[in-house]
């Protein structure tokens, strides 16, 4: 069996790859693994279970709840809430485990299972590996040890989760949003109720789009992967800014008053300055990834802020933040982590903090985001090559040195192996788009000839 867990839980086409049987089995396995790790020692264990609104979440939720309860875990079922809400509630309610059913920005037929440990943190790799091992052992015939009588778990609908999470969001804001008009695109997803309520309670005038989930329309032409509707709505309504989430609202992208996109790097730049001014940017450092735009790095250097870059993935950003004690990190895609207030990317919190900075300064989002200038970026995927030689080919190394010499300080080259396919990704940033395209094209040709 190949590894079930990816960088963000277990995902697949619901009822094909991710079946009710798999969801139930993984939940029982997770309960057994956490029990043997001592997480449940000395008390009756509790889990928080939430989901996004896609149709398959209903039967998968039933399977997860059944699995946990059959393993002796009491379940607080919080219903449709964002991933960061489930993480927050897992921590604030003192639960031993959290489970979120979502495939984030993926299309409706997909779904996923993500586990959180006590405190609302993602499970460590070794625990995920152990869950897979235990699941496979029992799938192939070894019986479970099952509680009976009063030992089985009880299931409760925890209806206070919505208000508790919104109150948390409002409570950590540095200032109110009175006077701001904000358009919210909720991707017909998990934040369709939460985000508009939070922005309204914070004082903003709110216009919503993509906030009518029917189980089938999640991420369908809307949300953070499709900004066209948000751009048009912001201009149409004369709003100060627009905020877009994905299906589980763990990410946030923005649009300024003119309908121009403000990406994750720009959001990080705005928040880094806000947190520095408030004395909250620990070690004057922000964490990004190797894909963070060079313009972001240059802007932070001008402001005396250090950028630490990790491998691609919010998991690696979070690991760096926790290990080094940094307060802010994220990705260009809009995963932003404010570690003092969240254990994972939180799109609603990010949007609120961005709007709060606009309200506090009286400056437009375009002006604030202008602290950094995005350098044109070109990405070319070169398939069917020996990706393992990307760092050892002398021919390729020579071509990279020549490209870097041509680009100078206002450009950069990044070659990355795909983690799942036999391809190499060539990324080039330059002062203008034509130069970036030319350099990327030449490097892609060398990759093809040297590694093909």
Swiss-Prot record:
One of its GO terms (molecular function) is magnesium ion binding. InterPro entries: A-D-PHexomutase_a/b/a-I, A-D-PHexomutase_a/b/a-I/II/III, A-D-PHexomutase_a/b/a-II, A-D-PHexomutase_a/b/a-III, A-D-PHexomutase_C, A-D-PHexomutase_C_sf, Alpha-D-phosphohexomutase_SF, GlmM_bact. Its cofactor is Mg(2+). The keyword Transmembrane does not apply. Pfam families: PGM_PMM_I (PF02878), PGM_PMM_II (PF02879), PGM_PMM_III (PF02880), PGM_PMM_IV (PF00408). Mg(2+) binds at residues 104, 246, 248, 250. Activated by phosphorylation. Keywords: Isomerase, Magnesium, Metal-binding, Phosphoprotein. The keyword Isomerase applies. Its EC number is 5.4.2.10. CDD domains: GlmM. The active site is at residue 104. It comes from the Bacteria. One of its GO terms (biological process) is peptidoglycan biosynthetic process. SUPFAM superfamilies: Phosphoglucomutase, C-terminal domain, Phosphoglucomutase, first 3 domains. It catalyses: alpha-D-glucosamine 1-phosphate = D-glucosamine 6-phosphate. It is an enzyme of class 5 (isomerase). The modification Phosphoserine is found at residue 104. Binds 1 Mg(2+) ion per subunit. One of its GO terms (cellular component) is cytosol. NCBIfam families: glmM (TIGR01455). Belongs to the phosphohexose mutase family. Catalyzes the conversion of glucosamine-6-phosphate to glucosamine-1-phosphate. This is Phosphoglucosamine mutase. The gene is glmM.
């Amino acid at each position: 069996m190949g590894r079930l867990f990816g960088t963000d839980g277990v995902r697949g086409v619901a009822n094909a790859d991710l079946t009710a049987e798999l969801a139930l089995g993984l939940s029982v396995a997770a309960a057994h693994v956490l029990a043997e790790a001592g997480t449940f020692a000395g008390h009756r264990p509790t889990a928080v279970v939430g989901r996004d609104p896609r149709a398959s979440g209903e039967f998968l939720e039933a399977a997860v709840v059944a699995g946990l309860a059959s393993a002796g875990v009491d379940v607080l079922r919080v219903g449709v809430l964002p991933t960061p809400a489930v993480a927050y509630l897992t921590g604030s309610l003192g639960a031993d485990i959290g489970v979120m059913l979502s495939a984030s920005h993926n299309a409706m037929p997909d779904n996923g299972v993500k586990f959180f440990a006590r405190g609302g943190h993602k499970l460590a790799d070794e625990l995920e590996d152990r869950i897979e091992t235990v699941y496979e052992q029992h799938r192939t015939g070894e019986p479970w040890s099952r509680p009976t009588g009063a030992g089985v778990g009880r299931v409760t609908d925890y209806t206070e989760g919505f208000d508790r999470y919104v109150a948390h969001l409002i409570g950590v804001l540095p200032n109110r949003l009175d006077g701001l008009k904000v358009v919210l695109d909720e991707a017909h997803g998990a934040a369709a109720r939460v985000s508009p309520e939070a922005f309204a309670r914070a004082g903003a005038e709110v216009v919503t789009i993509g906030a009518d989930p029917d189980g089938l329309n999640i991420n369908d032409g809307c949300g953070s992967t499709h900004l066209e509707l948000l751009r048009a709505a912001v201009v149409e309504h004369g709003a100060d800014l627009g905020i877009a989430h994905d299906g589980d609202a763990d990410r946030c992208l923005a649009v300024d008053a003119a309908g121009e996109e403000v990406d994750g790097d720009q959001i990080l730049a705005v928040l880094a300055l806000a947190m520095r001014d408030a004395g909250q940017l620990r070690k004057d450092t922000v964490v990004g990834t190797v894909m963070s735009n060079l313009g972001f790095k240059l802007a932070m250097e001008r402001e005396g802020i250090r950028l630490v870059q990790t491998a691609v993935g919010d998991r690696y950003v979070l690991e760096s933040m926790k290990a080094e004690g940094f307060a802010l990190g994220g990705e260009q895609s809009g995963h932003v982590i404010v570690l003092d207030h969240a254990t994972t990317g939180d799109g609603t919190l990010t949007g609120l903090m961005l709007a709060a900075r606009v309200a506090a300064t009286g400056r437009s989002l375009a002006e604030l985001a202008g602290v950094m200038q995005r350098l044109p970026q070109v990405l070319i995927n070169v398939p069917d090559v020996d990706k393992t030689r990307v760092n050892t080919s002398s021919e390729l190394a020579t071509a990279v040195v020549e490209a870097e010499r041509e680009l100078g300080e206002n450009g950069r080259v990044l070659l990355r192996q795909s983690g799942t396919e036999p391809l190499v990704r060539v990324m080039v940033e330059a002062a203008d788009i034509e130069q970036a395209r030319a350099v990327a094209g030449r490097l892609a040709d060398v990759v093809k000839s040297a590694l093909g």
